Amino acid sequence: MTKQTEYKRKPEWLKIKLNTNENYTGLKKMMRSKNLHTVCEEAKCPNIHECWAVRKTATFMILGAVCTRACRFCAVKTGLPTELDLQEPERVADSVVQMGLKHVVITAVARDDLKDGGAAVFAETVRAVRRKNPFTSIEVLPSDMAGVEENLKMLMDAKPDILNHNIETVRRLSNRVRARAKYDRSLEFLRRAKEMQPDIPTKSSIMVGLGETREDLIEAMDDLRANNVDILTLGQYLQPSKKHLPVIKYYPPAEFAELKEIALSKGFSHCEAGPLVRSSYHADEQVRSAKEKTAEAK
């Protein structure tokens, strides 16, 4: 077995306690009954049991379950996507009511087959959730929508409470990790979002363990801050299958703590960093912290 395909043994700090209580099974049944998808399941998130069973939160994945891209870190299915489901926004909104969520994250597969990248359905989902859940904060996590400004404007005009778009990795590794996305296009996407709606916090995420250096990570932090990104999440990359990129390094919790301190010193209003941190992990706490910092700055 070559170094590139070898599975590294996971360290103790990555072992997860599984919890499949009534909250977990109830949420799973509800998602199936409403024909909805979650990135928690599709992307094999390691926190699914904590979020579903303990925190009773979930990240809805709209626009189908098949992505038009094939990023080498991601477990989501790729291929020819299904037709748009125009009733999906209302079903998501109804599910948020049923779950009693105070904060909801809405993400989507990349839909490069659509002229608007799925922006219209994304925006309508935000509006539907807002109509039926006026006190629920809404976080959106879109693809770069091919970098088309009109698509981003359509989404930002729906006034989500937070705009999240992930650069995923450092500049040096970006082409290898996500060939059909572009590092600078993602930075521009984040910058334009802030220009369109200055009061809406922006957020991005970086996976570590793909071969990046500390200098690479600091450069990425500087790039995000130069484009006015407010919140950063840092988490350990975990190889979904042998077909995906291998893990080069497992970062210990102490190193994540160091990276968090560096990020906060750069001016991020909030940084969530840890081995099991994912973009939507404790998202409700992140948006609350960012809004408090924004209010203090005024």
Curated annotation (Swiss-Prot):
Top-level EC class: transferase
One of the entry's Gene Ontology molecular-function terms is: lipoate synthase activity
Known cofactor(s): [4Fe-4S] cluster
Per its UniProt entry, which superkingdom is the organism in?
Bacteria
One Pfam family this sequence matches: Radical_SAM
Q: State which pathway it belongs to.
A: Protein modification; protein lipoylation via endogenous pathway; protein N(6)-(lipoyl)lysine from octanoyl-[acyl-carrier-protein]
InterPro entries in the record: Aldolase_TIM, Elp3/MiaA/NifB-like_rSAM, LIAS_N, Lipoyl_synth, rSAM
Q: Give me the residues that bind [4Fe-4S] cluster 1, please.
A: C40, C45, C51, S280
Q: Where in the cell is it found?
A: Cytoplasm
- Tell me what this protein is called: Lipoyl synthase
The source organism is Bacillus cereus (strain G9842)
